[in-house]
Protein backbone atom coordinates (compact mmCIF):
# COMPACT_ATOMS: atom_id res chain seq x y z
CA UNK A 1 0.00 0.00 0.00
CA UNK A 2 1.36 3.41 -0.99
CA UNK A 3 0.72 6.19 1.55
CA UNK A 4 -1.30 9.22 0.48
CA UNK A 5 -0.50 12.80 1.48
CA UNK A 6 -3.20 15.47 1.64
CA UNK A 7 -2.27 19.10 0.99
CA UNK A 8 -4.37 22.20 1.52
CA UNK A 9 -4.39 24.48 -1.52
CA UNK A 10 -6.24 27.69 -2.34
CA UNK A 11 -8.71 25.52 -4.26
CA UNK A 12 -9.26 23.00 -1.47
CA UNK A 13 -7.62 19.71 -0.61
CA UNK A 14 -5.42 17.78 -2.96
CA UNK A 15 -4.22 14.23 -2.35
CA UNK A 16 -1.02 12.73 -3.75
CA UNK A 17 0.59 9.35 -3.42
CA UNK A 18 3.77 9.90 -1.42
CA UNK A 19 6.08 9.42 -4.41
CA UNK A 20 4.27 12.04 -6.49
CA UNK A 21 4.50 14.46 -3.57
CA UNK A 22 8.23 13.81 -3.21
CA UNK A 23 8.66 14.33 -6.96
CA UNK A 24 7.24 17.86 -6.55
CA UNK A 25 10.29 18.52 -4.34
CA UNK A 26 12.58 16.94 -6.97
CA UNK A 27 13.11 13.79 -4.88
CA UNK A 28 13.37 10.38 -6.56
CA UNK A 29 13.43 7.14 -4.58
CA UNK A 30 15.62 4.36 -6.02
CA UNK A 31 14.83 1.39 -3.79
CA UNK A 32 14.88 -2.36 -4.24
CA UNK A 33 16.63 -4.40 -6.91
CA UNK A 34 17.80 -2.53 -10.02
CA UNK A 35 15.79 -3.95 -12.90
CA UNK A 36 14.32 -2.64 -16.16
CA UNK A 37 10.95 -1.41 -14.86
CA UNK A 38 12.49 0.37 -11.88
CA UNK A 39 15.20 1.89 -14.09
CA UNK A 40 12.63 3.11 -16.61
CA UNK A 41 10.68 4.81 -13.82
CA UNK A 42 13.81 6.50 -12.40
CA UNK A 43 14.95 7.58 -15.89
CA UNK A 44 11.51 9.04 -16.70
CA UNK A 45 11.54 11.02 -13.45
CA UNK A 46 15.08 12.31 -14.11
CA UNK A 47 14.12 13.43 -17.62
CA UNK A 48 10.88 15.03 -16.40
CA UNK A 49 12.57 17.01 -13.61
CA UNK A 50 15.41 18.11 -15.91
CA UNK A 51 12.91 19.30 -18.54
CA UNK A 52 10.96 21.11 -15.84
CA UNK A 53 14.00 23.09 -14.60
CA UNK A 54 17.55 22.06 -15.48
CA UNK A 55 19.06 24.69 -13.14
CA UNK A 56 17.79 22.94 -10.00
CA UNK A 57 19.32 19.85 -8.41
CA UNK A 58 17.57 16.49 -8.34
CA UNK A 59 17.79 14.40 -5.15
CA UNK A 60 18.18 10.66 -5.74
CA UNK A 61 17.75 8.57 -2.57
CA UNK A 62 19.40 5.16 -3.00
CA UNK A 63 18.70 1.96 -1.06
CA UNK A 64 19.41 -1.04 -3.29
CA UNK A 65 21.18 -4.39 -3.24
CA UNK A 66 22.05 -3.84 -6.92
CA UNK A 67 20.84 -5.81 -9.88
CA UNK A 68 20.89 -5.51 -13.65
CA UNK A 69 24.04 -3.90 -15.06
CA UNK A 70 22.33 -2.69 -18.23
CA UNK A 71 19.43 -1.15 -16.28
CA UNK A 72 21.84 0.49 -13.83
CA UNK A 73 24.06 1.89 -16.56
CA UNK A 74 20.98 3.33 -18.28
CA UNK A 75 20.30 5.28 -15.06
CA UNK A 76 23.95 6.42 -14.81
CA UNK A 77 24.02 7.49 -18.47
CA UNK A 78 20.83 9.50 -17.94
CA UNK A 79 22.27 11.15 -14.81
CA UNK A 80 25.26 12.21 -16.90
CA UNK A 81 23.12 13.20 -19.90
CA UNK A 82 20.79 15.65 -18.16
CA UNK A 83 21.85 19.18 -17.24
CA UNK A 84 20.56 19.10 -13.65
CA UNK A 85 23.05 18.05 -10.98
CA UNK A 86 21.93 14.81 -9.34
CA UNK A 87 22.63 14.64 -5.63
CA UNK A 88 22.80 11.06 -4.37
CA UNK A 89 21.91 10.12 -0.80
CA UNK A 90 22.58 6.52 0.27
CA UNK A 91 20.29 5.19 2.98
CA UNK A 92 20.33 1.56 4.04
CA UNK A 93 22.72 0.26 1.43
CA UNK A 94 24.17 0.77 -1.99
CA UNK A 95 25.55 -2.56 -3.13
CA UNK A 96 26.81 -3.89 -6.44
CA UNK A 97 25.15 -1.85 -9.24
CA UNK A 98 23.87 0.48 -6.52
CA UNK A 99 27.42 1.67 -5.86
CA UNK A 100 27.87 2.57 -9.52
CA UNK A 101 24.67 4.64 -9.44
CA UNK A 102 25.25 6.30 -6.06
CA UNK A 103 28.88 7.19 -6.75
CA UNK A 104 27.87 8.72 -10.11
CA UNK A 105 26.09 11.64 -8.46
CA UNK A 106 27.43 15.15 -9.02
CA UNK A 107 30.89 15.53 -7.48
CA UNK A 108 30.63 17.30 -4.14
CA UNK A 109 26.98 16.23 -3.85
CA UNK A 110 27.26 12.52 -3.00
CA UNK A 111 26.01 11.79 0.50
CA UNK A 112 25.46 8.84 2.80
CA UNK A 113 23.55 8.41 6.04
CA UNK A 114 25.67 7.33 9.04
CA UNK A 115 24.49 3.71 9.30
CA UNK A 116 24.26 2.96 5.59
CA UNK A 117 26.61 0.48 3.89
CA UNK A 118 28.38 0.29 0.54
CA UNK A 119 29.52 -2.88 -1.22
CA UNK A 120 31.52 -3.39 -4.38
CA UNK A 121 32.25 -6.68 -6.10
CA UNK A 122 32.88 -8.06 -9.55
CA UNK A 123 29.85 -8.47 -11.81
CA UNK A 124 28.15 -11.83 -11.90
CA UNK A 125 26.99 -13.63 -14.97
CA UNK A 126 26.39 -17.04 -16.31
CA UNK A 127 24.93 -19.16 -18.99
CA UNK A 128 22.18 -21.60 -18.17
CA UNK A 129 22.64 -25.32 -18.30
CA UNK A 130 22.98 -26.95 -21.71
CA UNK A 131 24.84 -23.97 -23.18
CA UNK A 132 27.28 -24.56 -26.02
CA UNK A 133 30.98 -23.96 -25.35
CA UNK A 134 31.10 -21.16 -27.95
CA UNK A 135 28.25 -19.33 -26.24
CA UNK A 136 29.99 -19.77 -22.89
CA UNK A 137 33.15 -18.20 -24.32
CA UNK A 138 31.16 -15.27 -25.72
CA UNK A 139 29.42 -14.76 -22.36
CA UNK A 140 32.76 -14.89 -20.50
CA UNK A 141 34.27 -12.30 -22.86
CA UNK A 142 31.26 -10.02 -22.39
CA UNK A 143 31.51 -10.39 -18.60
CA UNK A 144 35.19 -9.35 -18.69
CA UNK A 145 34.33 -6.26 -20.80
CA UNK A 146 31.53 -5.39 -18.39
CA UNK A 147 33.87 -5.71 -15.42
CA UNK A 148 36.38 -3.35 -17.06
CA UNK A 149 33.64 -0.80 -17.76
CA UNK A 150 32.34 -0.91 -14.18
CA UNK A 151 35.82 -0.76 -12.67
CA UNK A 152 36.64 2.30 -14.79
CA UNK A 153 33.47 4.07 -13.62
CA UNK A 154 34.25 3.26 -9.98
CA UNK A 155 37.84 4.45 -10.43
CA UNK A 156 36.66 7.71 -12.01
CA UNK A 157 34.11 8.23 -9.23
CA UNK A 158 36.48 7.47 -6.34
CA UNK A 159 39.89 8.69 -7.49
CA UNK A 160 41.31 5.19 -6.95
CA UNK A 161 43.20 3.34 -9.66
CA UNK A 162 41.47 0.71 -11.77
CA UNK A 163 43.96 -1.78 -10.33
CA UNK A 164 42.90 -0.91 -6.75
CA UNK A 165 39.21 -1.23 -7.66
CA UNK A 166 39.93 -4.56 -9.40
CA UNK A 167 41.69 -5.95 -6.32
CA UNK A 168 39.08 -4.72 -3.84
CA UNK A 169 36.14 -5.93 -5.96
CA UNK A 170 37.53 -9.46 -6.29
CA UNK A 171 35.13 -10.51 -3.52
CA UNK A 172 32.28 -8.69 -1.73
CA UNK A 173 33.93 -5.61 -0.19
CA UNK A 174 31.65 -3.99 2.41
CA UNK A 175 32.26 -0.47 3.70
CA UNK A 176 30.73 1.62 6.47
CA UNK A 177 29.85 5.26 5.80
CA UNK A 178 33.23 6.36 7.19
CA UNK A 179 35.09 3.83 5.04
CA UNK A 180 33.07 4.84 1.97
CA UNK A 181 33.97 8.50 2.56
CA UNK A 182 37.66 7.63 2.95
CA UNK A 183 37.51 5.51 -0.22
CA UNK A 184 36.20 8.50 -2.20
CA UNK A 185 32.77 7.22 -3.27
CA UNK A 186 30.91 9.90 -1.30
CA UNK A 187 31.65 13.48 -0.33
CA UNK A 188 29.93 13.72 3.04
CA UNK A 189 28.19 11.70 5.75
CA UNK A 190 24.89 13.36 6.64
CA UNK A 191 23.67 13.38 10.23
CA UNK A 192 20.60 15.46 9.33
CA UNK A 193 18.87 16.80 6.23
CA UNK A 194 20.99 19.79 5.25
CA UNK A 195 20.51 19.52 1.48
CA UNK A 196 20.06 22.81 -0.30
Swiss-Prot record:
Top EC class, one word: hydrolase
Nucleotide-binding recorded as keyword: no
Protein localization: Cytoplasm
UniProt-annotated catalytic positions: 96, 121
Domain of life the protein comes from: Bacteria
PROSITE patterns: CLP_PROTEASE_HIS, CLP_PROTEASE_SER
Keyword Protease: yes
EC number: 3.4.21.92
NCBIfam families associated with the record: PRK00277.1 (NF001368), PRK12553.1 (NF009205)
Record family assignment: Belongs to the peptidase S14 family.
Subunit structure: Fourteen ClpP subunits assemble into 2 heptameric rings which stack back to back to give a disk-like structure with a central cavity, resembling the structure of eukaryotic proteasomes.
Name of this chain's protein: ATP-dependent Clp protease proteolytic subunit
Species per Swiss-Prot/TrEMBL record: Streptococcus gordonii (strain Challis / ATCC 35105 / BCRC 15272 / CH1 / DL1 / V288)
Originating gene: clpP
Amino acid sequence: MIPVVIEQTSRGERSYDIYSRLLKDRIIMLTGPVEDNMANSVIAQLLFLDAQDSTKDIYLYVNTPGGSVSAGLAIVDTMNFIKSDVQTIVMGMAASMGTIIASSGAKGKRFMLPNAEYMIHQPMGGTGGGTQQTDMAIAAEHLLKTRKTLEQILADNSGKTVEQIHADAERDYWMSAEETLAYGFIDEIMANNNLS
